[in-house]
């Protein structure tokens, strides 16, 4: 396949890139039993696939009404924010709570447009320098939350 075709952003190219990324990820984690290393590897894989510099796991604590960043992967040279973001009040993120209950992703593609509808959420992301975001929900037994990718640069149309 020519380089020109592979540079296009077609469903075939996206699927092929995803398959390659999953193969590399599976090979690197195949013999790992350390759950922290596995989660870090998955976050790194997600960030690299989407061309992002940071990916994290945000878990919901329904009893306390907060979101907690439990894992974070950052590209070299990017400052970690996990320790600063331990008790995210759910009332500032009503859209996220609704999306999680409906098992739907959260997408931020335009921070200015978001500010008109969800000003607290937009202010939060602006404060931390995030301008776009993709977040996919997960639910496993008692844990629920999102795997989030900050400022993705590739495959953002899906």
Indicate residue ranges for each PLM-predicted region.
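A short, aliphatic-rich beta-strand micro-motif
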Residues: 131-139
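Signal-transducing coupling segments at domain and membrane junctions
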Residues: 109-132, 151
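GAF sensory/regulatory domain recognition
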Residues: 47, 56-98, 104
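Soluble sensory domains of the PAS superfamily and closely related sensory modules
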Residues: 97-106, 113-117
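Flexible loop/coil segments at beta-strand boundaries within sensory signal-transduction domains
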Residues: 63, 138-144, 152
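Short regulatory alpha-helical segment in sensory/regulatory domains of signaling proteins that mediates
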Residues: 26-33, 42-61, 100, 125-126
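Signal-transmission linkers at sensory-effector interfaces
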Residues: 1-37, 48-49
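Regulatory loop-to-helix N-cap segments in sensory/regulatory domains
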Residues: 2-12, 115-119, 145, 150-158
């Amino acid at each position: 396949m020519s380089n020109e075709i592979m540079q296009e952003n077609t469903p075939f190219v996206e699927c092929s890139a995803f398959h390659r990324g999953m193969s590399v990820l599976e090979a690197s984690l195949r013999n790992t039993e350390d759950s922290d290393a596995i989660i870090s590897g998955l976050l790194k894989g997600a960030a690299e696939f989407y061309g992002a510099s940071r990916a994290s796991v945000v878990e919901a604590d329904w009893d306390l009404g907060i979101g907690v960043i439990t894992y974070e992967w950052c590209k070299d040279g990017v400052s970690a924010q996990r320790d600063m973001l331990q008790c995210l009040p759910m009332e500032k993120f009503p859209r996220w709570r609704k999306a999680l209950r409906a098992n739907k992703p959260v997408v931020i593609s335009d921070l200015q447009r978001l500010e008109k509808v969800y000003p607290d959420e937009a202010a939060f992301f602006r404060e931390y320098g995030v301008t776009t975001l993709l977040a996919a929900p997960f639910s496993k037994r008692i844990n629920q939350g999102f795997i989030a990718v900050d400022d993705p640069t590739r495959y953002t149309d899906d």
